[in-house]
Regions:
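Structural beta-sheet core signal
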Residues: 9, 55, 127, 161-162, ...
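Conserved beta-strand scaffold positions in the cores of enzyme catalytic domains, especially
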Residues: 29, 98-100, 159, 248-250, ...
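Cofactor-binding loop segments of dinucleotide-utilizing enzymes, especially the Rossmann-like FAD-
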Residues: 12, 58, 130, 164, ...
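Catalytic-core segments of class I nucleotidyltransferases/pyrophosphorylases
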Residues: 126, 134, 138-146, 150-154, ...
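Residues at the starts of beta-strands that form the adenosine-phosphate
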Residues: 6, 51-53, 97, 124, ...
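Conserved beta-loop-beta/alpha segment of the NTase-like Rossmann-fold superfamily
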Residues: 74-77, 84-179, 223
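N-terminal glycine-rich phosphate-binding loop and ensuing alpha1 helix
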Residues: 2-80, 98, 140, 144
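Well-ordered alpha-helical segments embedded in enzymatic catalytic cores
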Residues: 37-40, 111-115, 238
Length: 293
């Protein structure tokens, strides 16, 4: 069975929910404390054993490429001033093996994944969506979310969808799966999927939340997938077809997931990540407590 070595991160969207800041700044570069959102995603991929990353880019996304590139002038300035700690931070993002391709038309997530076909070269691969940041608590023995999916792939093969249960009022915001429970309550063999169903039409409350291991068979299916909900090529529609010909698993991963594509979710992530920081947590908590009096 092929090892999962490559990952794709779709990052071509306009980020309209965060206008006006996203008019000139990629949504993926908005910082959670002092680190761009997309860096958290890339770091999860690397911590999960991924060796090569393809970012599906788009118009006005050059800042992403610059962030993961070397910065000779800045590095020289930091080196001359003896700021070795900051120099190390700047250089660590430049050493990551990142590739880029443009999605020329915004035709949905399925079309964005299809842009990665030649890069994947017939191999199974990972997908990480930039709107989903997952905090894995190492003190509780939690592995990165993508690593958990790779472990399921290594054990069962096929494709693996990263899922969690969502509250009823959120069902219509996600792709929802149905299936037969396997090996305990955290793993299902998928029999059906519906993209953003009404609650009355949802087969469960188990939602796909931005992490995937996908068989290369998906590319042929995407090439023949007609635009679906919203007039876009839906990855969910192709995965539903994939489940008819190959095993597709839904795994409820451990970790706290933040919807950073939503303003409130982004604020929650910023606050909680700041509170976990050894250098910021104490003073910031004191500030919040004083603020809430």
């Amino acid at each position: 069975m092929a090892r999962i070595k490559k990952a794709v991160i779709p990052a071509a969207g306009f980020g309209t929910r965060f206008l006006p800041v996203t008019k000139a700044t990629p949504k993926e570069m908005l910082p959670i404390v002092d680190k761009p959102t997309i860096q958290y995603i890339v770091e999860e991929a690397l911590a999960s054993g991924i060796e090569e990353i393809l970012i599906i880019s788009g118009h006005a996304k050059r800042a992403i490429e610059d962030h993961f590139d070397s910065a000779p002038v800045l590095e020289r300035e930091l080196e001359e001033k003896g700021k070795d700690d900051l120099l190390a931070i700047v250089r660590e993002t430049a050493d990551i093996n990142v590739h880029y391709i443009r999605q020329k038309k915004m035709r949905g997530l399925g079309d964005a994944i299809l842009c990665a076909k030649s890069f994947m070269a017939g191999e199974p691969f990972a997908v990480l969506l930039g709107d989903d940041v997952v905090y894995a608590d190492a003190t509780k023995g939690q592995q990165p979310a993508l690593r958990q999916l790779i472990d399921i792939y290594d054990a069962y093969g096929g494709s693996v969808l990263g899922c969690q249960q969502v509250v009823p009022e959120k069902v219509s915001s996600y792709g929802i799966v149905a299936g037969k429970e396997i090996a305990g309550s955290k793993l299902l063999k998928v029999s059906d999927m519906i993209e953003k169903p009404e609650l009355s039409e949802a087969p469960s409350n188990i939602a796909v939340l931005g992490r995937y291991i996908i068989s290369p068979t998906i590319f042929e299916l995407l090439e023949h997938t007609a635009p679906g909900k919203g007039g876009e090529v839906q990855l969910t529609d192709a995965l539903k077809q994939l489940a008819l010909v190959e095993p597709v698993w839904a795994y409820c991963f451990e970790g706290k997931r933040y919807d950073v594509g939503d303003k409130l979710g982004f604020l929650k992530a910023t606050v909680e990540f700041a509170l976990r920081r050894p250098d910021l947590g104490g003073p910031f908590r004191s500030f919040l407590e004083e603020l809430m009096k």
